[in-house]
Amino acid sequence: MGGLASGGDVEPGLPVEVRGSNGAFYKGFVKDVHEDSVTIFFENNWQSERQIPFGDVRLPPPADYNKEITEGDEVEVYSRANEQEPCGWCLARVRMMKGDFYVIEYAACDATYNEIVTLERLRPVNSSSLATKGSFFKVTMAVPEDLREACSNENVHKEFKKALGANCIFLNITNSELFILSTTEAPVKRASLLGDMHFRSLRTKLLLMSRNEEATKHLETSKQLAAAFQEEFTVREDLMGLAIGTHGANIQQARKVPGVTAIELGEETCTFRIYGETPEACRQARSYLEFSEDSVQVPRDLVGKVTGKTGKVIQGIVDKSGVVRVRVEGDNDKKNPKEGGMVPFIFVGTRENISNAQALLEYHLSYLQEVETLRLERLQIDEQLRQIGAGFRPPGSGRGGSGGGSDKAGYTTDESSSSSLHTTRTYGGSYGGRGRGRRTGGPAYGPSSDPSTASETESEKREESNRAGPGDRDPPSRGEESRRRRLGPGKGPPPVPRPTSRYNSSSISSVLKDPDSNPYSLLDTSEPEPPVDSEPGEPPPASARRRRSRRRRTDEDRTVMDGALESDGPNMTENGLEDESRPQRRNRSRRRRNRGNRTDGSISGDRQPVTVADYISRAESQSRQRPLGRTEPSEDSLSGQKGDSVSKLPKGPSENGELSAPLELGSLVNGVS
């Protein structure tokens, strides 16, 4: 059997009196009505709940039943037979009265068993008869699920019970039904009429009661918060969704801040009120909820650099700052004011996140402006350098100004190191012209520089040799002369200049045609004296070279044989093989000093006779190994180096004891090209 939900001063069932085994009637309550019995549970549960036949049950006397008690009347005494049983109504007779005390004699006991009791324990004999099948009426009503908790309190059925005229109404928890018990048939008919109305009124009363409870709690909270700290702020209506967050996530996060007691939201006014124990807690909760919008003006010419390729730069700013989004205003958008030549970047997020985004963007703008200033300064310097270097550039040169020019072309250390800023330069430097040797492993100067790699191509040398005659030659053009000049001081050892020999293929042919002529006139390796007013390292003017080349040579002038004997490397024979019979000559400075003391100015005559091809081969070897500072490269040396093979010689000491750069040697096969 299910239990009953009781509450208030209303009995949880229909009150009855149940006859015990000793004839006394004990108080009980009817919980259910069956065909021939009723389910009774006793007061204080002194006995277990059980079904009792109608013959052992009667209704209690009416509440208005009152009868004066006199001597000799039969009465019922509220008493108990032993300590284990509760009190019940036992039948007795009044033997004597004295004031408020009555001497009673129990009918079931001997006449000698008397007891003195007060008037409160006496009542007239109950006139109700024992119950029958028609003594009790029951009506059940199904309770909606949302009202079951409310119906468990019997106080809510007080008016319904009065309207029905029922004896009791209670909720049976077992089957969630409302039991209506009565001793008359009228409540049964009315229950079907008033049932739906009763449930509707219950629902309305529950809603009002819940609102009253919330209002009461709010009143108590307001009284507590009146003396606490609070923060009040307003958020734009279109940003309320961001402020509240997904499913109220931001409000929940703000409420979890230690020290925050309550957060109120005025939806109509978009106003937040935060109450807390400390002002720091209120401010921290406000930082989670206060969303706003602010803009930063960006110069129009820097918009592309601020956004970056595919928006990478601006996306990094958004990720680092934590803003919700950023919007770049278009020209047609008139929502926000625009300054002249400026484009607004509008950030949306909390005030702290917007402040971080503004700091990042302003720093990036200042960086871009500084870079632009440096770029403009560099452009001005470049323009000034172009104007200064215009007088030294050949007028007809088509090599981009990088194939040589003035002696200052070698002083390009700073500009060479700044190639990260300017990958293309229009002044100074090397490897910039057409048809020149190009290197990617080093600057325009350095240890890896080699004069042979910077020389003209074979086609250019053929054109020059074809244009040149066996005797005089026109001075080289200004661009060619500048390419043959020695580079100025810079990084690495200085490059080795080309020798000044004046032999070529056409002059050799003339010697072969005229055997009686002096062959040594073609092999002059002497150096012209530089002019007094020329600077060190500058080649002599073209007119001086022309006059020097036409001067008749005497026996005092050095010949190719001198250079051949002083060669540092192995000589090449006419068959192109190394001459291993001759040892290497290393101390050339001592031999020159000894040669200066001779009267004829020549070497000893005990040498083997050599051919003209040997002279030419040795002269070419000498010209390739001539140390720096001896002579400047001449136009004839450029056209005369047409060897069919090139061999590398090991590094040897120069006249001043320093190591020279690696040299490339060429040789003629069979003495002719």
From Swiss-Prot:
Residues 458-483 have a biased composition (Basic and acidic residues). One of its GO terms (molecular function) is mRNA binding. Residues 388-673 are annotated as: Disordered. Residues 413-422 have a biased composition (Polar residues). Keywords: Cytoplasm, Phosphoprotein, Repeat, RNA-binding, Synapse. It holds the Pfam family Tudor_FRX1. Highly expressed in brain and testis. In brain, expressed in the subventricular zone of the lateral ventricles and in most of the granule neurons of the dentate gyrus of the hippocampus. It is found in: Cytoplasm, Cytoplasmic ribonucleoprotein granule; Cytoplasm; Postsynapse. Its main location: cytoplasm. Residues 584-596 have a biased composition (Basic residues). One of its GO terms (biological process) is dentate gyrus development. Residues 397-407 have a biased composition (Gly residues). The modification Phosphotyrosine is found at residue 78. Residues 228-276, 291-340 form the KH domain. The tandem Agenet-like domains preferentially recognize trimethylated histone peptides. Disordered region at the C-terminus undergoes liquid-liquid phase separation (LLPS) for the formation of a membraneless compartment that stores mRNAs. Belongs to the FMR1 family. Interacts with FMR1. Interacts with FXR1. Interacts with TDRD3. Interacts with HABP4. Interacts with CYFIP2 but not with CYFIP1. mRNA-binding protein that acts as a regulator of mRNAs translation and/or stability, and which is required for adult hippocampal neurogenesis. Specifically binds to AU-rich elements (AREs) in the 3'-UTR of target mRNAs. Promotes formation of some phase-separated membraneless compartment by undergoing liquid-liquid phase separation upon binding to AREs-containing mRNAs: mRNAs storage into membraneless compartments regulates their translation and/or stability. This is RNA-binding protein FXR2. The lineage of its organism: Eukaryota, Metazoa, Chordata, Craniata, Vertebrata.
